[in-house]
Amino acid sequence: MLASLFSKPQSSLSVQAKRLVAMRFLIYTGFQTSYFIGVIGTLTYADDASVVATSLAVLFMNVFVILGSFAGGAALDAWGPRRHFLLSIIGALATGTAIIAFGSATGVVLLGAVLLGFKMGFAQPIATSYPAYLTNDPVELKDINSAIAMFSNVSIIVGPTLGGFVAAAASSRAVFMLMMLFTVLALIAGWGFRPQTSHVAGHADADSAEEGECAGQSSNPSTSARATFATSIKTVFTNSVLALLFCIIFLSNFGYGAFDPLESFFYRDVLRVGVEWMGWLSSASGVGAVLGAVLALRLPPHLVNLKTLLVALMSVGLGSLLYVGTPYVGVALVGQIALGIAWGVVNPLHNTIVQTTAPLEQLGRVNSVMGFGNMFAGVAPLAIAPWLAATFGVQQTLVGAGMVVTAVPAALLLLGRWHLDCAAKQ
């Protein structure tokens, strides 16, 4: 049964699509080995830092993920996927080297959050934009996005599990060596990546074709800069589907921003487990997310829409309530799996909708605009998360955040039906 579920993405993807899946899997696994344990875990367990320090780490990281995504989107639109990928690899290796070299003092860890955030934001187009450089067929795009999501979620299993063992055997900072190892493996996997150009109109430059690059490879700077951020912002907010999607993701993720700075304290003070469990419970979420991505792969085309996305986001909220609702690690494990299943459906749905709606020559920057809404929604709650935790308690604050995450998509489904129907007809 399980083998039949996984057979479709393996048999239907092109060689270049499989290579793209491997690139994303390896570079994302490196990130997953290091962020939660290497940054938040070091602050909470090794440095015994406060909620304010972890909130600052998440704030810095989210802000620089936003900045990195804008830089990455601009680089992709100007130079194409192959050069963008090489820059992503260089940035990841430089980040790991810097964090290892400068020690584990709180200030250094916060700087590490900045570097890691920028690097992750810069590399995000690998998952969100590269598929559109391989095909413009909606069904094939859904298959590629589901496969990317599925193996990205395998990263959430593999990365934190390996990171947990390394942290238990050595230290929480040692996980950055793993990040660098997986980055080198990603470079090897991506060495032969060649985007397709046959479905892109208006890019007949011979040198660009030989390089296999798309969108803005002309030597004329004014040509490569034609898809400005202002144009991409206008594209998002003048298209009913993209505008609604931006608002849905922003509002639905608003409550979720309280989780990152408080989760490590939930593990330490409520579940009463060690730092390695931060990796292992994250891996449980990855198991669920793989199953969710398989479900997304099996969705019929008529369900690839904003209503299905809202149902999946509401399920994220319900899973988060189960995750943080009790002091029992076994229940938290089940909650993480449920939460992962929901996220496994959300991500490929979101990416497919964007890729089939936005113009290819603006796709990198359009995804940066969409990512800004997502990440800014996570930044805003950081200002009050420490106060809420001090006033009501860590677990109570997380339960309240889970209720917000559940209620927002439910309200949008009930109150925004007319707008959703109009967007579906576009």
Task: Report residues per predicted region.
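Juxtamembrane intracellular "pre-TM" segments in multi-pass secondary transporters
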Residues: 1-17, 196-246
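Helix-loop boundary and gating motifs at the non-cytosolic
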Residues: 2-63, 239-283
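Substrate-agnostic recognition of the 12-TM MFS/MFS-like secondary transporter fold
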Residues: 19-36, 61-74, 80-89, 112-168, ...
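Transmembrane alpha-helix termini and helix-breaking/packing motifs in multi-pass membrane transporters
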Residues: 38-46, 158-179, 269-270, 380-398
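Cytoplasmic membrane-interface "Motif A"-like loop-to-helix N-cap segments
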Residues: 78-89, 301-313
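C-terminal ends and interior cores of transmembrane alpha-helices
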Residues: 90-104, 314-327
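Helix-loop junctions at membrane interfaces in 12-TM secondary transporters
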Residues: 101-113, 324-335
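Helix-loop junctions on the cytosolic side of multi-pass membrane transporters
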Residues: 182-207, 414-426
